[in-house]
Amino acid sequence: MAADKPHMNLAVIGHIDHGKSTLVGRLMYEAGAVPAHIIEKYKEEAKQKGKESFAFAWVMDSLKEERERGITIDIAHKRFDTPKYYFTVVDCPGHRDFVKNMITGASQADAAILVVAAPDGVMAQTKEHIFLSRTLGINQLIIAINKMDAVEYSEAKYKEVVEQVSGLLKMIGFKPANIPFIPTSAFMGDNITKLSEKTPWYKGPVIMQALDELKEPEKPSTLPLRIPVEDAYTISGIGTVPVGRVETGVMKKGDKVIFMPGGAGGEVKSIEMHHEEIPQAYPGDNIGWNVRGIGKNDVRRGDVCGHTDNPPKVADEFVGQIVVLQHPSAITAGYTPVFHAHTSQIACQLISLDKKLDPKTGQVKEEHPTFIKAGDAAIVTIKPTKPMVIEPVKEIPQLGRFAIRDMGMTIAAGMCMSVKQK
């Protein structure tokens, strides 16, 4: 049923407890993505408990339970259809360390819904998520101003939050005029599939409509092949099977490929998606593939697969443009935090701070600053402590973005401007 519809990866972002999971649950429930036998089971329980929102409650319980067990939900549970697209929710993070997922998850997102609770307005993570989504190249946003029921559907409160969020968006180059701000109550179901009588003052699109009005992402199939490895399995009778998402390019059965930085390579014997063999894989496909002559020790998470004649770049050092989101003191040359780029996590040293920039305009404020701090943007030279694949963002945007983590938080986000190869 989904093959004929274009596919979109959707990130649902925002501050903890602002209603991200409830919104995902509501979207799935309204889109009919809850299996019938589950609905039946809950109908029985709901009858006994006198609750009517049984199926919705089921979605919420399963999301909550999966979150508490610390596992991500099976992909089948996290997909839903709108008239035009079918969506996969790539991440619905709830924890401080969600950023890790956001870097690996949001870099795969074509669009994001930012959930901001009306009673609270903009909070610390709201800011962090907006910055990160921009850095990670998400340029389509929908803003859900949620929990409107908690502010009695007040238009004044809605306008106040719109104002706050617009200010942030402008600061990093989004145009708020092109972004829908939708007053919602995910829990009550207001303005999700149809306009709510409780917000007669709101005339814009509802969430489902806004999702359908997103632009279809361009498939970067003409770029060189790049598949960051998420994991590698050993399957009896087949051998080593790396799995990952095709970011750019096309891989066909019989192609000669290489895994960098290790350098092992061979011929593609088979490609599988959703447990079915396919002749070729395109950007956005989550696949497993088997390469002749590749053993268990030749490939690991963080490696990148490409064609032998155009292999992924391995950086001896690289120049990055970064925005410092938060840091308790100041950052100087010599700082060695962990860089998260595609599926790799590698400690890298900032060997020089080259320029300090105005984060709004990108103009140079200072050459060779002695330090940079939260709120600063900068151009820096970076040396990975071990071999690492990264590409200039102008050449392969999907492999040019990174986040810098330290002390359990995202210190900075950035993009690679140029690579000095090993």
UniProtKB/Swiss-Prot annotation:
UniProt-annotated stretches for the region G1: 14-21
Cited InterPro entries: EFTu-like_2, G_TR_CS, GTP-eEF1A_C, P-loop_NTPase, Small_GTP-bd, T_Tr_GTP-bd_dom, TRAFAC_GTPase_members, Transl_B-barrel_sf
Chain positions covered by the region annotation G2: 70-74
Stretches for region G4: 146-149
Binding residues annotated for Mg(2+), in chain numbering: 21
Region feature (G3): 91-94
UniProt enzyme class: hydrolase
Recorded GO MF terms: GTP binding; GTPase activity; translation elongation factor activity
Listed EC numbers: 3.6.5.3
Main location: cytoplasm
Recorded GO CC terms: cytoplasm
Family under the similarity heading: Belongs to the TRAFAC class translation factor GTPase superfamily. Classic translation factor GTPase family. EF-Tu/EF-1A subfamily.
Protein's UniProt name: Elongation factor 1-alpha
Organism annotation: Methanosarcina acetivorans (strain ATCC 35395 / DSM 2834 / JCM 12185 / C2A)
